[in-house]
Amino acid sequence: MLTLKKSMLLLFFLGMVSLSLANSKRADEEGEDKRADEEGEDKRADEEGEDKRADEEGEEKRKRFLGGILNTITGLLG
């Protein structure tokens, strides 16, 4: 009976150690996934910011171009 208790205690201990290691490994992987997601979000935000800036610059160029054309046309007409 004593050897059975020792064996059961040993199995319980080894199972708890294994479970603890598995939980810590899973937590590490989740942390890495969160960091990767955050980095991906940062990159997307940077890309969106660049897109907005490019759109604004394009809009300014169009306004300048149209303004130049209108000035030329009014100069020719009047």
Curated annotation (Swiss-Prot):
* A Gene Ontology BP annotation from the UniProt entry: defense response to fungus
Stretches with biased composition (Basic and acidic residues):
25-60
Report the residues modified as Leucine amide: 77
Q: What's the superkingdom here?
A: Eukaryota
Tell me which GO cellular component terms the UniProt record holds. Answer: extracellular region
Keyword Signal carried by entry: yes
What residue ranges constitute the propeptide?
23-64
Q: Where is this region: Disordered?
A: 24-60
Q: What is this protein's tissue specificity according to the annotation?
A: Expressed by the skin glands.
Keyword field: Amidation, Amphibian defense peptide, Antibiotic, Antimicrobial, Cleavage on pair of basic residues, Fungicide, Secreted, Signal
InterPro entries linked to this entry: Frog_antimicrobial_propeptide
Q: Where in the cell is it found?
A: Secreted
- Which residues, if any, are the signal sequence? 1-22
Pfam families given for it?
A: FSAP_sig_propep
Query: What family does this chain come from, according to its entry?
Result: Belongs to the frog skin active peptide (FSAP) family. Brevinin subfamily.
What functional role does this protein have? Antimicrobial peptide. Active against the Gram-positive bacterium S.aureus (MIC=30 uM) and the yeast C.albicans (MIC=100 uM). Not effective against the Gram-negative bacterium E.coli at concentrations up to 250 uM. Lacks ability to induce contraction of smooth muscle in isolated guinea pig urinary bladder. Elicits histamine release from rat peritoneal mast cells.
Spell out the protein name for this chain: Kassorin-S
